[in-house]
Curated annotation (Swiss-Prot):
The gene is argG. CDD domains: ASS. GO terms for cellular component: cytoplasm. GO terms for molecular function: argininosuccinate synthase activity; ATP binding. This is Argininosuccinate synthase.
Length: 409
């Protein structure tokens, strides 16, 4: 079926995609590999050499960190995007960009097929397939691990049989995905929800009890909803995230252990490390509480939840997602200021916040005599505010609350 066909594979250098690359070669296809640097921290040249050794005709290594931060992470920050209220969606945010670049690479080499290493149980298969269909419906998507129905131990054996070096063993069978915005760890003993992750699972975050005994204060500056400075120093978003990952991670901040509802209908146990993402979203929410009206603050979480669901479900390039983007962007016009946080042994606590267009006014809020709040207006306000309730009670009296006749003795 694939004999002589050009196929561009989203290549990570890990077990799944390395097995796919060899499989394509065995099928007589002309496999090309695309490695997209989203901040994984792996030497790109090592990945290139590995793909060529396995059988890739050509390997594209593209640095997409700035595009990822600008076009995918930035909207997620403004939307406080957390799936299930906890997962900052770093993998889900990266997939539409990878699919977009796969299409570009396919056009460059004249490929008719693009491929990924997703399994049939995961969410990524949906994200890759749906995004490709949205951008290039003429291309055929191939997913060998899913279609082949090979389990992880079988993949490891296949890799060993074909001399494919992989960082996964039967003794350490973790599946890891990482980019600028976070790191996920799953599979192996982590599939038991009662199993506590051992220290070897984590790379970005220190064990909280072993973190420094002195707290670290950081100040994040925002302009129109986006972080632009760290401790007073203006930084590009990519560099700011990198620095904050290191700082917060050193203090054990940024771990998530959750049961997650996957798009395919099953629950999974997920371990995440996202020091910068969780701290930035925490700070951003705090600044919004200072600069947005009560009505916006009440309504925006519903938009944020739907934004997170669309991202998680692979519906990034859809009309609804674009409409939500427009709403969120409008809310961010005044979200400028700074938030100071205290990082200490796994916790991140807001220690202060300020904004040039803050809606908070100490003169109005203070209980001191110099308060400018006109308390004499309160009685009239309460009378009007409670009028509908009083009118309802008058027309529809509650018998249990009716006056009782005085008892006679």
């Amino acid at each position: 079926m694939l004999g002589g066909k050009k196929v561009v594979l989203a290549y990570s250098g890990g077990l799944d995609t390395s097995v796919c690359l060899k499989w394509f070669e065995e099928q007589g296809a002309e496999p090309y590999a695309l490695y997209l640097d989203l901040g994984q921290g792996e030497p790109a040249e090592d990945v290139r050499e590995k793909a060529l050794r396995i059988g890739a005709r050509e390997v594209f290594v593209w640095d997409a960190r700035e595009e990822f931060a600008r076009d995918y992470v930035a909207p997620a920050i403004k939307a406080n995007a957390l799936y299930g209220g906890r997962y900052p969606l770093f993998t889900a945010l990266g997939r539409p960009l990878i699919a977009k670049k796969l299409v570009e690479a396919a056009r460059r080499v004249g490929a008719t097929h693009i491929a990924h290493g997703s399994t049939g149980k995961g969410n990524d298969q949906v994200r890759f397939d749906v995004t490709t269909g949205s951008l290039a419906p003429d291309l055929t998507v191939v997913a060998p691990v899913r279609d082949w129905n090979m389990n992880r131990p079988e993949e490891i054996e296949y890799a060993r049989k074909h001399g494919i070096p992989v960082p996964v063993t039967k003794e350490s069978p973790y599946s890891v995905d990482q980019n600028l915005w976070g790191r996920s760890i799953e599979a192996g003993p982590l599939e038991d929800p009662e199993h506590e992750p051992t220290p070897d699972v984590f790379e970005l975050t220190a064990e909280p009890e072993e973190a420094p005994d002195e707290p670290r204060y950081v100040e994040i500056g925002f302009e129109r909803g986006l972080p632009t400075s760290l401790d007073g120093e203006k930084l590009p978003l990519v560099e700011l995230i990198d620095r904050l990952n290191a700082i917060a991670g050193e203090h054990g901040v940024g771990r998530v252990d959750m049961i997650e509802d996957r798009l395919v209908g099953i629950k999974s146990r997920e371990i995440y490390e996202a020091p910068a993402a969780l701290v930035i979203i925490q700070a951003h929410r705090e600044l919004e509480s200072l600069t947005l009206t009560k009505d916006v603050l009440r309504f925006k979480p519903a938009v944020e939840q739907r934004f997170a669901e669309l991202t998680y479900d692979g519906l990034w390039f859809t009309p609804l997602k674009s409409a939500l983007d427009a709403f969120v962007e409008e809310t961010q016009r005044t979200v400028t200021g700074s938030v100071r946080l205290k990082l200490y042994k796994g916790s991140s606590t807001v220690a202060g916040r300020s904004a040039p267009r803050a809606l908070y006014s100490k003169d109005l809020a203070t209980y001191d005599p110099e308060s400018t709040f006109d308390e004499s207006a309160a009685a009239g306000f309460i009378a009007l505010w409670g009028l509908p309730a009083r009118r309802w009670a008058t027309v529809n009296p509650d018998p249990s609350q009716a006056p009782q006749p005085a008892s006679r003795r």
